[in-house]
Amino acid sequence: MPTNENNKQLAIGWREWAALPLLGIPAIKIKVDTGAKTSALHTYKMETFNRSGMDYIRFWIHPLQRRKDIEIACEAQVLDRRVVRDSGGHAEERYVISTPIRIGPHEWEIELTLTSREDMLFRMLLGRRAIVGGDFLVDPKASYLHGKRPRKAYPSRKKKHKGISK
């Protein structure tokens, strides 16, 4: 869990930019969802494999909404498989991994379930298990208290220039 040198609660907004450094994800927009027990990361393709007798998963994500040109392949050791119910009560078995998350200067280990969130606005939900015990204060009126997306995290879209006709 993040440490706070002044022993004060760490304020986070209902949405923040985060990094998942060990997964090679420099920036991803997250929704802090205290109503969700587990954290979830959007993946659009997954495959499991075995490495030295351990179960691993390789998965691909589009970390930015509406930017399918940006694709990141990730690998992590499988921690567990769990049945998770979504807000509509639908049950789904999901792979669970453990990885550090960074929000602003604070970094700590969290568990993430992997699922398809293609139609969702946020590519990642940060559930209450990830923030319990960390002395967080979620401000439901605030957004991006720890900064906007770093400009150089991903390439910008190339602007289409109109050609000069002769």
PLM region spans:
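Pepsin/retropepsin-fold aspartyl endopeptidases
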Residues: 1-166
